[in-house]
Amino acid sequence: MANTKKSAINQVVTRDYTIHMHKRLYGVSFKKRAPRAIKEIVAFAQKHMQTKEVRVDPSLNKEVWKRGIRNVPHRLRLRLSRKRSDEDDKALYTYVQAVDVANPKMETTVVEE
């Protein structure tokens, strides 16, 4: 019998994640750490939200770069929102924002808006 469930990939959803940047940037030379961090965040969003297009919020970019190119935060709390594109109703994209928390070592949660 065929699977009759609808795929959850096409739904609009928002989730909070904690991403361990130190694990992803270990061994990267100093002058490439912050640019690589942005690339790793985009790859993380593509993998977890299963969209090709990822848009990074300017506040997240400032959060990554606030201590310079070398000293990227060890952990970041991210809010990933899968949204519908304005041009094409079927196209989905992921919008990545930084979440300001005192302790970023929290669990992944689903955000109700």
From Swiss-Prot:
GO terms for cellular component: cytosol; cytosolic large ribosomal subunit; preribosome. Transmembrane segments: none annotated. The keyword Ribosomal protein applies. GO terms for molecular function: structural constituent of ribosome. Keywords: Cytoplasm, Ribonucleoprotein, Ribosomal protein. One of its GO terms (biological process) is cytoplasmic translation. The keyword Ribonucleoprotein applies. SMART domains: Ribosomal_L31e (SM01380). Gene3D superfamilies: 3.10.440.10. InterPro entries: Ribosomal_eL31 (IPR000054), Ribosomal_eL31_CS (IPR020052), Ribosomal_eL31_dom_sf (IPR023621). Its main location: cytoplasm. It is found in: Cytoplasm. Component of the large ribosomal subunit (LSU). Mature yeast ribosomes consist of a small (40S) and a large (60S) subunit. The 40S small subunit contains 1 molecule of ribosomal RNA (18S rRNA) and at least 33 different proteins. The large 60S subunit contains 3 rRNA molecules (25S, 5.8S and 5S rRNA) and at least 46 different proteins. PANTHER family: 60S RIBOSOMAL PROTEIN L31. Belongs to the eukaryotic ribosomal protein eL31 family. Component of the ribosome, a large ribonucleoprotein complex responsible for the synthesis of proteins in the cell. The small ribosomal subunit (SSU) binds messenger RNAs (mRNAs) and translates the encoded message by selecting cognate aminoacyl-transfer RNA (tRNA) molecules. The large subunit (LSU) contains the ribosomal catalytic site termed the peptidyl transferase center (PTC), which catalyzes the formation of peptide bonds, thereby polymerizing the amino acids delivered by tRNAs into a polypeptide chain. This is Large ribosomal subunit protein eL31.
